[in-house]
Amino acid sequence: MKIISYNVNGIRAALRKGFIDWLKSANPDVICLQEIKAQVDQLDLSVFEKAGYCYNYWFSAQKKGYSGVAILSKTEPNKVVFGTGIESMDFEGRNIRADFEGVSIMSLYLPSGTNLARLKHKLEYMDLFQNYIDKLKKEIPNLVICGDYNICHEAIDIHDPVRNKNISGFLPEERSWMSNFLNNGFVDAFREFNSEPHNYSWWSYRANSRQNNKGWRLDYTLITKPLQEKLKRAVILSEAMHSLSLIHISEPTRRIT
């Protein structure tokens, strides 16, 4: 199973820039999208269906033009869950889950902490999400969480860890949360195959950051440990300002009910 995660920074803008042609070429079985910035009634879903993704599910923020996540799939999932059921988490449309045969795939867009109020919201969201996932793993042991976590976990994941140590996205409490999340039964898929520095998924538009590779690895695919032996490949596809994360896992066989 080939899974891609992609923060599109606006699906309507992405469509105008050739998203469908790219999607056909990349040809994932499932693609998780973040920051779609659109309501379903603003989209022509037939373009996704014609590209082979007849099963597409959208979870938009209540605020138009903001946040939102989606999952597009070639095959029909057994079940789709929109959000967590916790109102304080779901009004911004930040996670959606699709359960397939033997594996559940989630598209996640964690909040950013652009100011003190948003940082407080982000930290509260992270705690609630941790509790939600702890319970979910007991029900669904084979879980893939793809998305934009808005956190650089280790110094290796950011171009200048010293100067950015007090910036949201690399704060000690954010990094500690990520460590605890991983230690609670998850694996960073990319780091299973690549331990080298300078592998980033986001670059500022300022000061030629992309050209100089002054980036941040904010996007992760985390898998539960039962899936670790099934992981075949994990890479960052540096094709956009928010790079794409791709993993291959061997086809699971256990049915999720």
Could you say what each language-model-derived stretch is?
Residues 85-86, 110-126, 162-166:
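Surface-exposed cleft-lining segments at the edges of enzyme active sites
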Residues 1-9, 102-112, 146:
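Active-site-proximal beta-strand elements of phosphoester/diester hydrolases
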Residues 247-257:
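Single conserved hydrophobic/aromatic residue that forms the stacking wall/gate
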Residues 40-42, 65-66, 114-116, 152-162, ...:
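Short catalytic/ligand-binding loop motif for oxyanion handling, primarily in non-cytosolic enzymes
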Residues 27-30, 47, 51-55, 127-214, ...:
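Metal-dependent phosphoesterases centered on the DNase I-like endonuclease/exonuclease/phosphatase
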Residues 37-39, 45-113:
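Structured beta-strand-rich core segments of catalytic domains in phosphoester-bond hydrolases
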Residues 1-51, 55, 61-69, 153, ...:
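N-terminal, active-site-proximal structural segment of metallo-dependent hydrolase catalytic domains
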Residues 64-80, 197, 209-229:
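Conserved beta strand-loop-helix elements of the APE1-like EEP
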